Amino acid sequence: MVKKIYMKSALITGGLGFIGSELAKSLLKKKIVNKCIILDNFGSFISPLKSNFKDYRQQRLENVKNIIIERGDANNQQITLKLLQKYKPKFIYHTAALPLAKIENLNAKEASIGSVDATRNILESLVFVKNNRRNYNFKRFVYFSSSMIYGDFKTKIVNETSSANPKEIYGTMKLAGEVITKGLSNYYNIPYTIIRPSAVYGPKDMNQRVSQIFINKAINGSNINVHGKTERLDFTYIDDLVNGVILASTRKNGINNTFNITNGKGRSLFEFVSILKKHFPKIKFTIKNRDKFRPKRGTLSIKKATKLIGYKPKTTLEKGIYKYLKFLKVI
């Protein structure tokens, strides 16, 4: 009798997105799992009528083996139950949400669907399947939060115990998702990890984050509006984030813990433009007032992640911008 081989798989909600797709490739490359199930609603959050940005969704997972793509919403219990019962994933990475704060701030209901409703639904679906399936050795539920949950930084550097006081819808919904993750996971005895990233950038991003906007305007010779010369963000290269997420979700010290997974060094928007100027000497920019509705941010401490899971980002902003430009074949 041939012994049935069970695949070790991961379910990634929002897996066609910038972060989810890179995570899927890395999980397979590092052989953490041998199959990734992608649950994505195929939504695009940029207007095809206005956008000058390339749609990278097809290219993100092109020619990647052992990927199964399922179309659907993470808040649909019928879909999540079907996928959990069929594949029994060891890991669930919940990245599905509106990708930008400015989009969520205009769509409170949609914002709550990804961070609140979907989080609750996934955890409840997981509990149902675990209770009705023998030998389901589930490893970790990973919730993707945001540095926006801190609101205005009260200090130059914030750590995971700093007060959470969001000042807009995006941060509020992300924090609500954290509370749901902790509450339901503790009640149902589900091992979880919460990730707080910041200003993620890198190749194949297409959702008009500030880094992408600045780079595209530099390439096109358009004027860059810098809203707040000293405005600081903890820019995090996509490879570093993905590496940190995998460490946090596979190390024992990551169980039932929250981590800032960033570069660990705040850099100003003016510094970002100055780095671009080295590659594009004729770059044009205008300094404008900062957006008063955006929280004042800076550096997120990564000491906890370094100590507990061995996280060490490798990509400086200078190196990350260079790699991004090289991908775009403009240098």
Regions found by a protein language model. Give the residues of each.
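Hydrophobic alpha-helical packing elements
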Residues: 19, 79, 111, 173, ...
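N-terminal Rossmann-like NAD(P)+-binding domain of SDR-like oxidoreductases, especially those catalyzing
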Residues: 1-196
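C-terminal substrate-binding subdomain of Rossmann-fold SDR/epimerase-dehydratase oxidoreductases
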Residues: 218-331
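A short beta-to-alpha transition loop/helix N-cap that caps and shapes the active-site region
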Residues: 45-49, 151-152, 203-204, 268-269, ...
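Nucleotide phosphate-binding site architecture
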Residues: 102-105, 150, 164, 201, ...
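Residue-level signal for the nucleotide or nucleotide-sugar donor/cofactor binding architecture
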Residues: 75, 106, 114-117, 161, ...
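NAD(P)-dependent short-chain dehydrogenase/reductase
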Residues: 53, 155-156, 167, 179-233, ...
